[in-house]
From Swiss-Prot:
Gene behind this protein: serS
Molecular function in Gene Ontology: ATP binding; serine-tRNA ligase activity
Species: Shewanella loihica (strain ATCC BAA-1088 / PV-4)
Domain notes: Consists of two distinct domains, a catalytic core and a N-terminal extension that is involved in tRNA binding.
Subunit architecture: Homodimer. The tRNA molecule binds across the dimer.
Protein name, as recorded: Serine--tRNA ligase
Substrates-to-products reaction catalysed: tRNA(Ser) + L-serine + ATP = L-seryl-tRNA(Ser) + AMP + diphosphate + H(+); tRNA(Sec) + L-serine + ATP = L-seryl-tRNA(Sec) + AMP + diphosphate + H(+)
Function: Catalyzes the attachment of serine to tRNA(Ser). Is also able to aminoacylate tRNA(Sec) with serine, to form the misacylated tRNA L-seryl-tRNA(Sec), which will be further converted into selenocysteinyl-tRNA(Sec).
Amino acid sequence: MLDPKFLRTELEATAERLATRGFILDVDRLSKLEEKRKSLQVATEELQASRNAISKSIGQAKAKGEDVAPIMAKVGDLGAELSSKEAELKQLLEELNAIAMSVPNLPDESAPIGADENDNVEIRRWGEPKQFDFDVKDHVDLGEQHAGLDFKSAVKITGSRFIVMKGQIARMHRALTQFMLDLHTTEHGYTETYVPLLVNEDSLLGTGQLPKFGEDLFHTKPATEEGQGLSLIPTAEVPLTNLARDTIIDEDELPIKMTAHTACFRSEAGSYGRDTRGLIRQHQFDKVELVQLVKPEDSMAALESLTQHAETVLQRLGLPYRTVVLCTGDMGFGAAKTFDIEVWLPAQNTYREISSCSNMQDFQARRMQARYKAKSAKKPALLHTLNGSGLAVGRTLVAVLENYQNADGSITVPEALRPYMGGLTQIG
């Protein structure tokens, strides 16, 4: 959520910056609503002052033995008018808040301006794609060859875009998760955190999934006892970041770095027909998430380090990748700046996204009222929040299967994973 004061005082400048990400802010409507808000605010304050002044005169009139009925009637009339104006102002503020909640974050000035993914800027590559002297198989064929990826059973049990994993493929999936968690906790300084897979509406509002992206979520039925329904998490970013909601953190505790391995659930609304084969786009998938809570002046440096932490996973696994900075038109709703890491998939002969690392600056913190207290400051200030995949486990499995395949369809186990697979060097 943008700073409401900034939105009011810098409306034209805000609209211009939002336009670079393809969002058209209705300046005329907001201007009219703001003028109306000011008018109602003044009227409400004047009515309150008048009522208070007249109310004080009641005691004076009583002391003089005067008839106070006319004064009390006047106070009643003012009270009724005040209630009406307050109700009108409340409704208007709710309308302004609803608009503010639908406005995306302002892109950072360092983000390249562009319309879509074609305008993203590659900033580095690591590793060279392997040249195979045989026809490569994709991960679906490899997984089925080793009886490790069972899409048919998943369709029978649940439906499309789900998977049943078995045997050494399932073991490799688990090994990847353990390897990622160990790397981030022992070398990168993150605290492993276990979080709920179901979250409430306040949490989804806090991180920006609601109100705009409700259709992308899986919702439970309304809970009678709780008074509201819960939703399955689309990413561990939601529960991890919301740990800071409605809290004031001491400056000495920052930065806070958390990691969690969870299943994630997405309806993939709007993705009909895209990546229908294999593990690339699933309704349920595992991910190791990285979240950082930092002081504002540290957030851009934190974005660089968080991105490097995700890249290190691919480097240790020996998987070629490239890193791109997203242009303004391709960034997520709450992001001020984003780096995407794309891993090389031989069967597709291209790089595919495996991690998205974003600096949300104070966008989420304002929604959540997540603050910190500096020793030199009189008042708490908003935190900056960052998140990224470290990594998406299923897509990493895809990359390992395809990049480490041999001519006979066997899979060489990357050295980094062998300690997690009982020393196994090859599948098949």
